[in-house]
Regions:
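Sec-dependent bacterial lipoprotein signal peptides
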Residues: 1-15
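Mature catalytic core of soluble alpha/beta enzymes
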Residues: 15-360
Length: 360
């Protein structure tokens, strides 16, 4: 359900200010700055990635690109021959797939965990609903209530409902029983976070202890930056029509061995007949959310969880999200919300642990 513009987060060790005094990332200078560790940049999953390592390890750029390419071949909904695309186009019955690197199965398992944890507010079967509202094609379509009801009948990620996955395979070959022909999966709300975790596992396997990994705005860090300090991350202030050149920071946090992901609705919406329609769809109703939450930032131990929960909180809204955090303190996650109050003014909520992360 993450149809938002990525990069709700900004790394701050190489920044400049534009004419308005806003902080912006100077990526060109970052690439040229030899004092900032080993740097890798590239494109993946329809977005960009940045990997910075402050340890002496062997060059990894080809390995990173190959892993992310294989990740796309497993989970991209835009590559026609990806495992996910083939499953979505499959009519019904037993679908067989090869998952040598376990990317597909890991995404299924992580997605089901967040789906159950959020009581369905995070739902990877939302693809038909997103498509029905025109968000897949970037067209403004408002389906009638009958269409919404028929689309909602295709939702639900409980095991065996629309899909029954068999995790016992041979020679990395697995199968899934697709029970509903028009049911489709969309892992956009969690896959980028999972790909961050995968790259971090690669780095740690090479002995890296100090690194920064960012893919599409989802971030995981460990250890220290080139200045010997904790990694510093900025969180965008929700401003409509903002971009990398005019962004304003709401808060700055310092992290070690943590992941951070932000999801928001303030950049992605369309307006028709004076009504704004958010691109964040509630799978429980089939309609765009109407609450006042503008962005949700989650800090967690792994990026897949942070990514998925950030999307779930955008569906929940501020009150339900705060209740969730208070009732699930065993998860070791922290939350930062930005929302409009009843007077239309922005307010924030920080979990107790999040407050300790703020750069003083």
């Amino acid at each position: 359900m993450k149809i938002i513009s990525a990069l709700g987060l900004l790394i701050l060790f190489s920044v400049s200010c534009n004419s308005n005094g806003d902080v912006v990332l100077d990526e060109e200078s970052l690439q040229k700055d030899d004092s900032i560790g080993i740097k890798y940049f590239g494109n993946t999953q329809g977005t960009t990635y940045a990997v910075i390592v402050n340890d002496e390890i062997e060059l990894l750029n080809r390995e990173i690109d190959e892993i992310l390419h294989q990740f796309d071949l497993a989970l991209s909904s835009y590559i026609p021959n990806s495992t996910l695309s083939k499953l979505n186009k499959y009519s019904a019955g037993v679908f067989t797939y090869k998952d040598s690197l376990s990317f597909f199965n890991r995404c299924i398992e992580q997605s089901r965990f967040v789906y159950e944890l959020s009581s369905g507010d995070f739902d990877p079967t939302v693809y038909p609903l997103v498509d029905g509202w025109g968000f897949m094609k970037n067209v403004e379509e408002i389906p009638d209530s009958l269409a919404v009801d028929s689309l909602r009948a295709l939702l639900g990620f409980s095991d065996g409902y629309h899909f029954k996955f068999n995790y016992v395979g041979q020679d990395s070959v697995y199968n899934v029983t697709k029970k509903t022909p028009n049911a489709k999966l969309d892992f956009n709300a969690l896959a980028q976070g999972l790909s961050v975790d995968v790259i971090c596992e690669l780095l740690e396997g090479k002995g890296a202890k100090n690194y920064f990994v960012e893919i599409g705005g989802e971030v995981r860090v460990k250890g220290l930056n080139s200045d010997g300090k904790l990694w510093t991350i900025g969180i965008d202030k929700p401003v409509e029509k903002s971009n990398a050149l005019n962004r304003v920071l709401q808060e700055i946090v310092q992290l070690d061995n943590k992941s951070i992901a932000t999801s928001g609705s303030y950049r992605k919406f369309y307006e028709k007949n004076g009504v704004k329609y958010s691109h964040t769809l509630d799978p429980n109703t089939g309609y765009p959310v109407k609450h006042s939450l503008l962005s949700a930032t989650v800090v967690a131990n792994n990026c897949a969880l942070a990514d998925g929960l950030a999307t779930a909180f955008m569906v929940m809204g501020p009150n339900k999200a705060v209740k969730f955090i208070k009732e699930n303190q065993n998860l070791d996650i922290e939350l930062f919300l930005i929302f409009d109050n009843s007077k239309g003014r922005q307010e924030t909520y920080m979990s107790k642990g999040f407050k300790s992360l703020i750069l003083k």
